[in-house]
Swiss-Prot record:
GO terms for molecular function: ATP binding; tetraacyldisaccharide 4'-kinase activity. Pathway: Glycolipid biosynthesis; lipid IV(A) biosynthesis; lipid IV(A) from (3R)-3-hydroxytetradecanoyl-[acyl-carrier-protein] and UDP-N-acetyl-alpha-D-glucosamine: step 6/6. It comes from the Bacteria. It comes from Salmonella newport (strain SL254). The keyword Transferase applies. This is Tetraacyldisaccharide 4'-kinase. GO terms for biological process: lipid A biosynthetic process; lipopolysaccharide core region biosynthetic process.
Amino acid sequence: MIARIWSGESPLWRLLLPLSWLYGLVSGAIRLSYKLGFKRAWRAPVPVVVVGNLTAGGNGKTPVVIWLVEKLQQRGVRVGVVSRGYGGKAAAYPLLLTPETTTAEAGDEPVLIYQRTGAPVAVAPERAAAVKAILAAHNVQIIITDDGLQHYRLARDIEIVVIDGVRRFGNGWWLPAGPMRERASRLKTVDAAIVNGGVARAGEIPMQLAPGLAVNLRTGARCDVAQLSNIVAMAGIGHPPRFFATLEACGAHPQKCVPLADHQTLAPADVQALVGEGQTLVMTEKDAVKCCAFAEDNWWFLPVDARLSGEQPDKLLEHITSLVR
């Protein structure tokens, strides 16, 4: 229903316009207060790169963060990552991730980024506190913040926006009548706009999510996902249909697709109940970090990597690297 409202297919969005105007008024006032100096943002002693969205819902932001961290690491840059830690609840904040940190504490995306990149990761509702925790514990040269484009309390040097190339900005309205956190005109002030799928427009960086081999949660074995049979697909991400479409494009045709809420807590019994005898469960890598502790032999995940094309990605990386002292 929300997808139909935000796309404009359902006329119900009009009923939510008063709330959207209020949202837009408040969010605009907050941004203006920082722009005019009525409120002061905290500036870290190292460059800060924000990777965020203008819209609610999954746009492919986490793969972009992983891509950026890995590319900077390849250039010899010491990178730290901070996040709000949505879906997690730690005993105390800020929380520096360790190999023992669970998704229940830190959230699924920070754990995934930590496992994939090995970079220091810290979570806290106040991102400045997370940055300070990393700087106190690690000699990093740059901070990447996973989400937080609208978190103006943290000053930033580079802003990168990730856009869903198919859904774009839906009906163009602020939350809750539409998907917008800020107006589309905000794109004029960011350093880069990365478009996940669809057709990139002038000045935007095209990106595709490239699937790898399916990985068994229990054994780590790998195989072409199309070789798996009787698949039940599960996706607890911002936009589950994208994952299901990826499976179809890989030649894996699920018997059943189970969309879950983003950052949803997964109970072992609930996940186990999705799969019948002779069936195979295939999930996203983000779901896998939540399920690995209780995985069955027939559970697999399909990793995806961001693939950015054209000359702009290298120019962006050069610009970011030039900020490192």
